[in-house]
C-alpha cells in the first residue's frame, strides 16, 4: 500500500483534452460527445497562470486511433513552464520516445499496458517515473473491467492487471471510473482507496470531480496513496476556479476546513 505524509497537499492536474486541434471535453469518454473549449495553448496557459504545477495533456484523436495532434501538443508543451503529463495513443517504443521528445515530464500508457504485458514491463523498467499506467475501468455485472483503445475494448479484470503491474514495479497509476468521467457526479472514492491499498504505487484520481467538496474528499485520502487528481469538466464548466481548488486541497493538508 502506498502511503503519504498527512501534511502533503493533493496535487491537481488540470486537463486539456485535444481533438481536431481544439481543447474539448467528452462525456464518459465517448467519441462524438465533444464540447469544444477553444485553443489548447490558451487553456493550458490559463491553468498555468492560475497556479497549476502540472497539466494533463491528452491527444484524443491518437487515443481513438483516428489521427494525431502531436505537433500541436509538442508546441503546447514547449510553451509551458510547468510539468506536463502526456496521454493518448502511446502504444510502442516509437510513440513513447516521440511523446517524451516533447519535453513532457511524464507519459501515460493505457491500452498497450493491457495488451502487451511484456512491453509494459520493459517500459516500467527502462523509464521509471517517466511512465504512469492508466487504468480506465467500468463496473460490468459487479466486476471491474478495464477499458482500452479509447474505452472501446475490454482490457481484462482490474485486480488481476493491478497485481501484475504492481509486481512489475509500476511507479504510478492513473485510475478512471469511466462511468464518472465528464458526468460531474463525484469521483469514486471507494474504488480509488481500494486500488491504493492494493499497490505500492501512488494513485492519480481521474473522472467525476464536480465540486470543492470532491477536492476535499480526495485530499483527505492523500495519506492512503491517492496523491493527485486530474480535473477537467468542472473547471471548464465554471463549477469552481483552479485557485479555489488548490486552496481547498491545501486547506485539508493544513488541517483547516476551507
From Swiss-Prot:
Its main location: cytoplasm. One of its GO terms (biological process) is L-tryptophan biosynthetic process. The keyword Mitochondrion does not apply. One of its GO terms (cellular component) is cytoplasm. The active site is at 17 (proton acceptor), 136 (proton donor). The gene is hisA. One of its GO terms (molecular function) is phosphoribosylanthranilate isomerase activity. Keywords: Amino-acid biosynthesis, Cytoplasm, Histidine biosynthesis, Isomerase. Pathway: Amino-acid biosynthesis; L-histidine biosynthesis; L-histidine from 5-phospho-alpha-D-ribose 1-diphosphate: step 4/9. Its EC number is 5.3.1.16. It catalyses: 1-(5-phospho-beta-D-ribosyl)-5-[(5-phospho-beta-D-ribosylamino)methylideneamino]imidazole-4-carboxamide = 5-[(5-phospho-1-deoxy-D-ribulos-1-ylimino)methylamino]-1-(5-phospho-beta-D-ribosyl)imidazole-4-carboxamide. Belongs to the HisA/HisF family. PANTHER family: 1-(5-PHOSPHORIBOSYL)-5-[(5-PHOSPHORIBOSYLAMINO)METHYLIDENEAMINO] IMIDAZOLE-4-CARBOXAMIDE ISOMERASE. It comes from Corynebacterium jeikeium (strain K411). This is 1-(5-phosphoribosyl)-5-[(5-phosphoribosylamino)methylideneamino] imidazole-4-carboxamide isomerase. It is found in: Cytoplasm. It holds the Pfam family His_biosynth.
Amino acid at each position: 500500500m502506498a502511503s503519504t505524509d498527512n501534511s502533503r497537499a493533493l496535487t491537481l492536474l488540470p486537463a486539456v483534452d485535444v481533438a481536431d486541434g481544439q481543447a474539448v471535453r467528452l462525456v464518459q469518454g465517448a467519441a462524438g460527445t465533444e464540447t469544444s473549449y477553444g485553443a489548447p495553448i490558451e487553456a493550458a496557459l490559463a491553468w498555468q497562470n492560475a497556479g497549476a504545477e502540472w497539466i494533463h495533456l491528452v491527444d484524443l484523436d491518437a487515443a481513438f486511433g483516428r489521427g494525431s495532434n502531436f505537433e500541436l501538443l509538442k508546441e503546447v508543451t514547449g510553451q509551458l513552464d510547468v510539468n506536463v503529463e502526456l496521454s493518448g495513443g502511446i502504444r510502442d517504443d516509437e510513440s513513447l520516445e516521440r511523446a517524451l521528445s516533447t519535453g513532457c515530464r511524464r507519459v501515460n500508457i493505457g491500452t498497450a499496458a493491457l495488451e502487451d504485458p511484456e512491453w509494459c514491463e520493459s517500459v516500467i523498467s527502462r523509464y521509471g517515473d517517466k511512465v504512469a499506467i492508466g487504468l480506465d475501468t467500468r463496473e460490468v455485472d459487479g466486476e471491474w473491467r478495464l477499458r482500452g483503445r479509447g474505452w472501446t475494448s475490454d482490457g481484462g479484470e482490474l485486480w488481476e492487471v493491478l497485481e501484475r503491474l504492481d509486481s512489475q514495479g509500476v511507479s504510478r497509476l492513473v485510475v478512471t471510473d469511466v462511468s464518472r468521467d465528464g458526468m460531474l457526479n463525484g469521483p469514486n472514492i471507494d474504488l480509488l482507496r481500494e486500488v491504493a491499498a492494493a499497490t505500492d504505487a501512488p494513485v492519480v484520481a481521474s473522472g467525476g470531480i464536480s465540486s470543492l467538496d470532491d477536492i476535499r474528499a480526495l485530499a483527505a485520502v492523500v495519506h492512503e496513496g491517492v496523491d493527485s487528481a486530474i480535473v477537467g469538466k468542472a473547471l471548464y464548466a465554471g463549477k469552481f476556479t483552479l485557485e479555489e481548488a488548490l486552496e481547498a486541497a491545501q486547506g485539508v493538508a493544513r488541517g483547516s476546513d476551507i
